[in-house]
Amino acid sequence: MSTKVNLLTFRISKMGILTAEEKQFYKDNGYILIRNPFTAQELEELSTEYDDLFRRKNEAKTESSWVGSDETNRKSDSPYTVKGIHNLQMHHAVFGKLLYHDKLLDALEDVMETKNIVLHHTKAHYKPPEKGASYPMHQDYHYFPYKNDSMVAAFIHLDDASPENGGLCVFPGSHKLGPLEDVGVRDNSHFHYVDQSKFPIEKSTPVMARRGDVVIFSYLLVHGSPANLSARARRMLLVQYADAHDVPTAGERAQPARGLVLRGVNLYRDATVANRHVE
C-alpha cells in the first residue's frame, strides 16, 4: 500500500459550503474526505439500525463479495466474506432521513456543480473481522454509465477505517482517464473491474477515515479495498447520486426510489398520466 496519503480533509462549515481549494482538490483528485458531518445522535441512530438490519436478515442470502453469481446467492468455498444489503431506505426510516441530510447535500451540490440532485441507489457493506473479503480495483461507471458522468458516491464510515480493516483505497486523479477497459467483461466475470496489473492495490492511496467521515468520489475514480484481517469490523454504507438531468446510456436494473429528487427539481420528469407507472 502506498505510504503517500494524498488527502485534503476538512470539517463542513455551518452552511456546508466547500472552499475554492476544496472544490479544486476534488476536480484534481476525483474524491474528497469530509470529516464527520453528523451529530452524535444521528450517527448513533444510523449505527444502531445498521446493526439491527444485518442481524435480522438471512446472512446466507446477503453475500456481497465478488464470487459466484446472484443466481446462487454468490455461494462459494472462500473463507472470506462481505455481507451486503441494498435499498436501505426500504428497510428503515433512518436511512430515508439520511438521504435528505442538509450538510451532506450542501457538499454534494458543490462537488457535483448542480442544485438538482437525485438518488440512484443505496447499499451497506459489512466486512467482518479477520475474514472480510477484498474488492478489486474498479470504476463504478461500468455498472451504470451516464451520459454526462455526473454520478458520485458518498461513502459513509460507521467505523474507523484503514487498510488493516479493509478500508477504502483510491487512485487519485484516475477519474480523468475516463472509462477504462472493463477487464471483468473480458474475463467473462459477473463483476466489473479494471486491469489489476495497471492499478495494483499495493500502489493505491488509502483513505484513513474515522467513524462518521464521508468520502465523496466520482464514479470514474478507480477504487477498491483490501481484505479485513484485523480484529475490527468495517461497517459502511453508500449513497449513489446523479444530476437530475443526466440520463443513463445503457439499460440498467430498476432500483427502488431511483430518480427520487433529494434537492432541487427534475424538469424532465414525465408527468403524462399514461406513464405514471413508469420508473
Ranges and model annotations:
Residues T3-D28, R35-M137, Y143, V183, ...:
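Non-heme Fe(II)-dependent double-stranded beta-helix
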Residues K14, K176-E279:
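Conserved double-stranded beta-helix
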Residues L33-I34, A154-I156, V215-F217:
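Short hydrophobic-aromatic micro-motifs
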Residues T39-A40, A124-K127, H142, A161, ...:
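Short, solvent-exposed loop/turn segments at secondary-structure junctions
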Residues H91, H120, S150, E164-G166, ...:
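Residues that flank catalytic or metal-binding motifs in active/ligand-binding sites
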Residues D106-E109, G132-V207, D246-R253:
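Catalytic core of non-heme Fe(II) oxygenases with the double-stranded beta-helix
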Residues T122-A124, A154-I156, L237-Y241:
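A structural signal for short, well-ordered beta-strand segments
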